Design a protein with these regions (language model features):
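Structural alpha/beta surface segment adjacent to cysteine/selenocysteine redox centers
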Residues: 1-79, 183
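C-terminal cap of thioredoxin/glutaredoxin-like
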Residues: 57, 61-185
Length: 185
């Protein structure tokens, strides 16, 4: 299957052809630049990420920190360096960067190991209502679809915290309680 650029893929998926897709790419690159990030989506190819996601499960088997590091490396490879994250050489290099065992990486890439876990992730995302990426889930109860402003994330994180850490509700008055100045009974 021939690869297509991100702009071509977006134009096909959302309509308007490559020109409309390129406008979307330009906007994403501009938003990233406002945050001090250099995205090279205009050079990136739209590729499948099944093997990358399976390696993320391998990394999680080692530790959450390793999975986070691999995710960051894969995102940088794709968005910043415009690398093909379906290419096994790119995946091997990313895995090596975060210290994953090369033998285990080869075993996963040469098999379907973690395919079931990845499929479970897809089913869970569908159950959450995710229809695209990015999609963020906070505390298993709040979903944030797409690139949203920081205030949206702050609001959701605050709400999730408040939901799980309710404030004490005072019942009755404080007239018959003792305080730092003595008792008012």
């Amino acid at each position: 299957m021939p690869t297509e650029t991100v702009a071509e893929s977006l134009g096909r998926k959302y309509g308007g052809g490559p020109a409309a897709g390129q406008q979307m790419v330009d906007k994403m690159e501009a938003v990233a630049a406002e945050e001090g990030l250099l995205f090279r989506l205009g050079e990136a190819q739209h590729v499948g990420t099944v093997d990358a996601h399976r390696l993320l499960h391998l990394a999680l088997a080692e530790s959450t920190a390793t999975q986070v590091a691999l995710k960051e490396e894969l995102l940088a490879a794709y968005f910043v360096r415009a690398e093909n994250v379906a290419d096994h050489d790119v995946l091997r290099a990313a895995a090596a960067t975060v210290g994953l065992d090369a033998g285990r990486v080869e075993e996963v890439l040469g098999s379907q190991e973690y395919a079931d876990a990845m499929e479970a992730d897809i089913r869970q995302a569908a159950a959450y209502g995710a229809t695209g990426v990015p999609f963020f889930v906070v505390d298993g109860r709040y979903g944030i679809s797409g690139a949203q402003p920081p205030g949206t994330f702050a609001q959701v994180l605050t709400q999730a915290w408040d939901d799980t850490h309710p404030r004490l509700q005072m019942v009755g008055g404080t007239d018959e309680a003792c305080g730092p100045d003595g008792c008012a009974i």
